[in-house]
Structure formats: structure tokens, C-alpha cells
Amino acid sequence: FLATASLAPDGVLRVDRPFSRIFQRYGRLVMPYLAALTVCVLVAEVARPWLGEEVVPAEPSLGQLLAHGLLLQDLLNYESLSTGVWYVAIDFQLFALALALVGLPAVLRQPTSAARWAPVALVFIVAVASLALFNRQARLDETAFYFFGAYGLGMLAFWVGRATRTSTWCSAVALLALVGAGALAIDWRSRIAIALVTALLIAVAQRRQWLSPAHWPAAAVPLQQLGRISYSLFLIHFPVLLAVNALVAGLGPHGPWVDLLGMIATFGLSVGAAVLLYRGVEARPASLRSVCTLFAALLVSGLIVSY
């Protein structure tokens, strides 16, 4: 949804330098990701004696660190250094695939009359193929094609929400619902059902302008703030969890109240760490120098724990 808003809000690619945009996306994704992985590698080394190998990732190899930095860890079958890092790699693949699909008609120099609809048609075709075929093949779950069904629904929902004619909007929503229902009839998948319902709700919300912050109640402000740091929170919560669990384990036998306090502390510390990660890394402009510096920090952390 958001990728469509930045790449082709009107169905025509608005990016002059696609490869530069791909690197920009890579930088935005990996800067906080590399910083969080560096913290995780160091925290895991401290927590390992208290929690054991089953809970804590093993000491990383150089190849494993390089693969994670290049977002190739799953494709190269390396064990993850933290929870959820597969999502970052898939998000980057999905963005690159979306950019390729939206930009292909321009490369092929389609006639002006077809230039607006060709990208939408390509996204629709690949999304349907993903829903009906690719998403049902477990061996493809390390690639963007496996997830593009849900991603494509979000892209299509954005374009549907911008339809000016009521009849066009209703027809597009009906087609979107029909495609999703057909995919679920072929093979029920709860995640696809959630993606379909979410896409339809977003299309309605965009149509009624509910997505504008001006229409949100004051009580939603804290949620907006949490949403702003949500990516950093997603990345940093695991090393915080490891650190708190190691501390609790080091206390020896304890009761449920200690576990409860540990959970509360984990949440509070995770939010605090996410704020620091967001302000110190994620909110800063992506640059080659910053990416290389953070990549080097990850490699150095691996060397530190290996000796």
C-alpha cells in the first residue's frame, strides 16, 4: 500500500532512477536492522551461559554475518541471528519486485493510453499467480513470489481507493473481493484471509478519507507515536528479551511475580530501546557511508564474540 503511494500513486512510475531508489530502500531497511543485529550478537554472547543454545542464537560465522547484511540469509540457508529478520529480507524483495512490475511498461515504451493501466494489470496478474500458485508452495517462502499475493492486494487497494467514479470503485472492490475469495476457495489460508479483509477495509477507509490523521481522535496519538517506532521496536525487542531473561535466570529460583515483572520490564525497555534506535539510526537519512559503517559494526561484533 505505502510502496504504491510512493512509486506509482496514479498507476505510472514516478521514479527517475530505479536502482537508486532500490538502494535507498535497502538503506532505510538495513540501517536500523544492522544496528539491532549488532546489539543482538553482543547480547546473545552474554546471555548464552544463562539461557543455553536452544534459546540463544549460536556464535555467528563470517558468512552468516555477510549474508544477513546483504539480506540473503534465508536464500543461502543460514540460521537467523534474531527473530523476524526474514521479514526484512522479504520486504526488500517485495519492494524490488513491485518496482520492476510498475516500471516494466515504461521500459517497454507502452503507448500513452496503456501506460497507466499496464502496471496495474501486471501487479494484478502476478498477485493472482501468487495467491493461486506460488503461495501454496512452501519451498518458495524465501522469495517475494510467495508473499506477493498479500503485498499485491495492498497495492491494488491503494489504486482502488483512488478511483473517482463510484461505479469504478464498486466494481474494483468487488473484483478484489472475488479474487481473494477465489484464492481462499482453492486453498484456505488464514493469513491470506486477513490480508484480504485488511485490503478491503483500507480501500473503504481511503475512500472515506479515514486514513488522514486529521480524522483520528486525540486518544490515537500514543498509537501514532508507537507506530512511528514500530519497525525499530520489531528489530530491537529480541535482544532486550534475551537480556531480561538472562537477568531473571541469573536470580535463581523465583516465583510468578518475578516473571510478571520481567515481562513488564521487557516491554518498557523494548519501547525505550526502540525510541533510541529510531532517533539515533532509523530517522536519519540513508547514505552509503552510514550503511557501510553499520555493516562494519556488525562484522566487528561477530569477531568480538568469536575470540
What is the meaning of each model-derived region?
Residues 31-39, 93, 232-236, 290:
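Hydrophobic alpha-helical transmembrane segments of multipass membrane transporters and ion channels
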